[in-house]
Amino acid sequence: MDDKQWERFLVPYRQAVEELKVKLKGIRTLYEYEDDHSPIEFVTGRVKPVASILEKARRKSIPLHEIETMQDIAGLRIMCQFVDDIQIVKEMLFARKDFTVVDQRDYIAEHKESGYRSYHLVVLYPLQTVSGEKHVLVEIQIRTLAMNFWATIEHSLNYKYSGNIPEKVKLRLQRASEAASRLDEEMSEIRGEVQEAQAAFSRKKKGSEQQ
């Protein structure tokens, strides 16, 4: 495909990311209206660059005419404050009627050897386009802020070392992953106190805005 064909091919994926970001951010807004803790802290999204798509297709032996079977061309990340929030968000997504969950991978219960932790869902999302309805695959990653910090660092190191991270650095990453996991556990233990403090701050902020 030339540049124009790739641009046309990626249009529905960009549309899917933007629509889902609006919908998922809307969930957080509804919790805020109710002065309740939102299991969603924030949402980000992206469409894979063409170079990354081609690299993965080569690595996974995916022919170009089957490129739509790639599950993460469109991707969203949902960040949560607490590990328990991940289960709540997961149940919300499974209950939705505007897309269908077609795959899931739990890297929290069984983290990768590198130390990577996250919960992945793949959904089939229907789009309304000028040519009619089109379904695209979107990967949704759900993780805590600590998990996301670790994953961002690992991604940067993978890029720096072209996927061949030195063993000494790998060991430090694994230790950092264990530390991040302990942090999540500790935060879960004081969840009630954290939420009370956040609620008090939110009430104070609203009060000052109304004055």
Swiss-Prot record:
Q: What induces it?
A: Expressed during exponential growth through the transition to the stationary phase, but not during entry of cells into stationary phase. Protein continuously expressed with a peak at 2 hours after inoculation, decreasing until 3.5 hours as cells enter stationary phase (at protein level).
Q: SUPFAM superfamilies given for it?
A: Nucleotidyltransferase (SSF81301)
Binding positions for ATP? Answer: R46, V47, K48, S52, K56, A57, R58, R59, D72, R77
Entry EC no(s): 2.7.6.5
Which biological process, per GO, is one annotated for this protein? guanosine tetraphosphate biosynthetic process
Catalytic activity as recorded in UniProt: GTP + ATP = guanosine 3'-diphosphate 5'-triphosphate + AMP; GDP + ATP = guanosine 3',5'-bis(diphosphate) + AMP
Query: Where is the catalytic site?
Result: E139
Give the GO molecular function terms: ATP binding; GTP binding; GTP diphosphokinase activity; kinase activity; metal ion binding
Query: What does the annotation give as the result of altering N148G?
Result: No stimulation by (p)ppGpp, protein still forms tetramers
Please state the pathway this protein functions in, per its UniProt record: Purine metabolism; ppGpp biosynthesis; ppGpp from GTP: step 1/2
What does its activity-regulation comment describe?
Allosterically regulated by its own products; pppGpp simulates synthesis 10-fold more than ppGpp. 2 pppGpp molecules bind in a regulatory cleft in the middle of the tetramer in an asymmetric manner. There is a specific contact of Lys-25 to the gamma-phosphate of pppGpp, explaining why pppGpp stimulates activity but ppGpp does not.
Binding positions for Mg(2+) per the UniProt entry: D72
Protein residues bound to guanosine 3'-diphosphate 5'-triphosphate 2: K21, V22, K23, L24, K25, G26, I27, R28, E41, F42, N148
Q: Pfam families given for it? A: RelA_SpoT
Keywords on record: Allosteric enzyme, ATP-binding, GTP-binding, Kinase, Magnesium, Metal-binding, Nucleotide-binding, Transferase
- The residues forming a coiled coil are none
**EC class:** transferase
Phenotype on deletion?
No visible phenotype, double yjbM-ywaC and triple relA-yjbM-ywaC mutants are also viable.
Effect caused by changing R46G: Loss of (p)ppGpp synthesis, protein still forms tetramers
Keyword field contains Chloroplast: no
Question: Would you identify the family this protein belongs to, as annotated?
Answer: Belongs to the RelA/SpoT family.
Subunit comment: Homotetramer.
Q: Please name the PANTHER family in this protein's record.
A: GTP PYROPHOSPHOKINASE YJBM
The protein, known as: GTP pyrophosphokinase YjbM
Q: Which source organism does the UniProt entry give?
A: Bacillus subtilis (strain 168)
